[in-house]
Amino acid sequence: MNAHTEKLTVQGPAGLIEVLRDRPEGVSRGHAVIAHPHPLFGGTMDNKVVQTLARAFVQNGWVALRFNFRGVGASQGQHDHGVGEAQDLLHLVGQLAPEGALALAGFSFGAYVTSHAIEALHPQRHIEKAVLVGTAASRFEVAPVPPELHDRTLVIHGEADDTVPLASAMDWARPQGLPILVVPGGSHFFHGQLPQLKSWVSRHLSAHE
C-alpha cells in the first residue's frame, strides 16, 4: 500500500466488507469501484490485474475503491455466485460513492459482477467510465452493456486466454456491437503485459466524450 491508501471496513448486506481506498494527488475526478476475480479460485482485491486497474484510475485522478467480496479476507459472509457480490458492490457505491462521477471496473468474475451492477444502476446513476477485463462470459451470464454506455466502456481480452476463451467474449459482445480490445498473445492474467494493460486503461480514462 502507498501513503494514499486507507483500509476501511463497511457494514454490508452480509456483514463487514473489507475495502482499500487509494486516493490520487489533489482533487479527485470521482470514485472508481473495482471488482476482483473469482473467490473460489483465489481471487482477492490484491490480485495483480485489480491492482493494475486501481493504479490506472488513481494516476488519472480517480479515487479507487477495491474490496473483498463476501467470504474473502476480512469480509464476512459466504460466496453467493455473483448475486450477493453484486449487492456488495452496489452497497459500496451507495456508502462510499453516493454522488459525483462514478466508474466501475472488474476483472474476470469481477467483470461479470460489474456488468450486473451497471445494469442495476443505469440510467438512474450516471456511469462515467466502465472497464471490463477478461470478462467471464464462458462461465456466467454476463449482462449486456447498455448502448448508451458503449463509448464509455473499455472491454479488454487476451487473445490466448485459456480460462475464458476469446471466442466466448466475442459471442457475448457481438450481438451488442460492442468492441473488444484484443491483446495479441495475452493470457487471462496478462502475464508480462500489465504495464501495457495500465496504459490502455489510462488512455481510455483520459479520453473525453
Question: Which functions belong to the PLM regions below?
Answer:
Residues 149-150, 155-157, 161:
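Short beta-strand/loop motif that positions the catalytic acidic residue
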Residues 37-38, 131-140:
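Active-site nucleophile loop of the alpha/beta-hydrolase fold
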Residues 186-198:
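Catalytic histidine-centered segment of alpha/beta-hydrolase-like enzymes
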Residues 104-106, 133:
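Short beta-strand immediately N-terminal to the catalytic nucleophile in serine-hydrolase-like folds
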Residues 106-114:
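Gly/Ala-rich beta-loop-alpha elbow adjacent to hydrolase catalytic centers
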